[in-house]
Amino acid sequence: MVKLIKSIKAHNDKAWCAKSHPTLPLLATASTDRTSHIYNLSAKKNFPLLAKLEEAHKRSVRSVDFKPPLGGVESPVDDFLDLPALATGSFDSTISIWGIDEPEEQDSMDDGDDDDDDEKINDKHAQLLTSINNEWNLMAIIEGHENEVKSVAWNYQGNLLASCSRDKTIWIWETDPETLEEFECISVLSDHQHDVKHITWHPSQNLLASSSYDDTIKLYKQDEDDDDWSCVGILNGHGGTVWCSSFENPTSPTFDANKIRLVSASDDLSVRIWSSIVEQTEQIEDTTDRLPSSIKSTNNEMVWEEEAILPAIHKYAVYSVSWSAKTGKISSTGSDGKLVIYRETESKKWEIESVYESAHGVYEINSVSWCTLDDKTEVLVTAGDDGAINIWEP
């Protein structure tokens, strides 16, 4: 049974998005009021506000995403204090990068770390990096898009940042994840016919998925031979705008190493799961390698199929979907105000586990995301048109 833990009146206008840091108990929000807020995901501390990021954008902040730790979530660099950084995408067509300076307390902590085990050191670092004493500073403003930026997303290693826009393009920016001093555009992808609503990276490889007003989802990879990025898959099946997608995480208990799976949410009221068999993709790559270069399209082409349509429950457009890395459950929400959780049975069928009606009262819900508190408890976080950020016990 879904239970409301905390409702934060975060913004004076629509809250578009709420995302957590991959390893730290930090939550960032995006709003029409042109600001982003950062909160400490600590129930014991009552989810305190750590920072208000403002005056960087002239229009709505539509999307936020924290940079993963150096080396990735599963294999972070041990001898490096990875300071948190946040990307914000705005309707003013720009992207802002925010971060903190190294805390002064770090030097005194390092002196006493020799007697502590790794877990204690990590806990100390987490407390330090999520302290209310840290000042969040604007590090960079990235320009390039012609129209509103709808979504921003870091890859799993934190060296690539993707952005998508109403201008129908996806830009991929490369940076040094240690310094974040410069962002170089290494690719502009123009495969969609209309507004690109959302982008997301695979949790453990450089595979990018985009969702669009043209009713499709497109997948992109970098060519190993010439480093060019190209479309390697097109998912057709939705009968309306695709608002959002989310990859299954390899840490999920339902994960199958032979498959890559993606869940999507659409204006057609459906939530769908797509899968790509790794062996089939490898066979295509092997065949393509034997073809003359004049007729090769790409050696990264992927075979995708629609694996399932989740039980119908939404009455209006489904705006957001999120796949839990901890339990393998999926959550969706949207225009009808419902917060829905689905689970996969042992027979590989999907069923509805719970539904919470009017999760933001009479208001639409724009995003849902699985997040982890400082005590390792998994929660759901929703952002609504009422400006509220709601935190739920699933």
Swiss-Prot record:
Interacts with NAR1. It comes from Debaryomyces hansenii (strain ATCC 36239 / CBS 767 / BCRC 21394 / JCM 1990 / NBRC 0083 / IGC 2968). The gene is CIA1. Keywords: Cytoplasm, Nucleus, Repeat, WD repeat. It is found in: Cytoplasm; Nucleus. Essential component of the cytosolic iron-sulfur (Fe/S) protein assembly machinery. Required for the maturation of extramitochondrial Fe/S proteins. GO terms for biological process: iron-sulfur cluster assembly; tRNA wobble uridine modification. The lineage of its organism: Eukaryota, Fungi, Dikarya, Ascomycota, Saccharomycotina. One of its GO terms (cellular component) is nucleus. This is Probable cytosolic iron-sulfur protein assembly protein 1. Coiled coil: none annotated. InterPro entries: CIAO1/Cia1 (IPR028608), G-protein_beta_WD-40_rep (IPR020472), WD40/YVTN_repeat-like_dom_sf (IPR015943), WD40_repeat_dom_sf (IPR036322), WD40_rpt (IPR001680). Belongs to the WD repeat CIA1 family. It comes from the Eukaryota. WD repeats lie at residues 10-49, 56-108, 144-184, 191-230, 237-284, 313-352, 359-394.
